[in-house]
From Swiss-Prot:
GO molecular function: RNA binding
GO cellular component: cytosol
Name assigned to this protein: Transcription antitermination protein NusB
One Pfam family of this chain: NusB
UniProt keyword terms in alphabetical order: RNA-binding, Transcription, Transcription antitermination, Transcription regulation
Function: Involved in transcription antitermination. Required for transcription of ribosomal RNA (rRNA) genes. Binds specifically to the boxA antiterminator sequence of the ribosomal RNA (rrn) operons.
Coiled-coil stretches noted in the UniProt entry, renumbered to this chain: none
Transcription as UniProt keyword: yes
Protein family: Belongs to the NusB family.
PANTHER family, per database record: ANTITERMINATION NUSB DOMAIN-CONTAINING PROTEIN, N UTILIZATION SUBSTANCE PROTEIN B-RELATED
GO biological process: DNA-templated transcription termination; transcription antitermination
């Protein structure tokens, strides 16, 4: 499967870890999806999920200046997670920024409110790689 599919699973894993008050580890959360999606790039998923979790404070500080009249805590969980994922990938991978932003926009269209993809696109366009 593609990196796009891996990003969807990484998003769902991060969402699950954020909304549930649980002792579930990242590895355990990823193990749950392995049975249904054995053809995914689990090294990439693990890298992305752990990167977002380990660098969350720095990612939020990178995103905050680009949130006009918003705070990171007021964003929808889905938007916040997508912004963190994309920002981490922009800063820590060799994937072209344009590809990362486009994938984030597509995730937002799939998992967030109708017009939020425009907001996500605008914020990420201002993140320096």
């Amino acid at each position: 499967m593609s990196r796009k599919d891996a990003r969807v699973q990484a998003f769902q894993t991060l969402f699950q870890l954020e909304i549930k008050e649980t002792d579930l580890t990242i590895q355990e959360a990823i193990e749950f999806i392995k049975d249904d999606h054995s053809d995914l790039d689990f090294d990439f998923i693990y890298w992305l999920v752990t990167g977002v979790k380990d660098h969350q404070i720095v990612l939020d500080e990178t995103i905050k200046p680009h949130l006009k009249d918003w705070s990171i805590d007021r964003l929808l969980k889905s938007d916040r997670i997508i912004l963190r994922m994309a920002t981490f990938e922009i800063l820590h991978s060799d994937t072209p920024k344009k590809v990362v932003v486009n994938e984030a926009v597509e995730l937002t269209k799939q998992f967030s409110d109708d017009d939020h993809y425009k907001f996500v696109n605008g914020v990420l366009s201002n993140i320096n790689d």
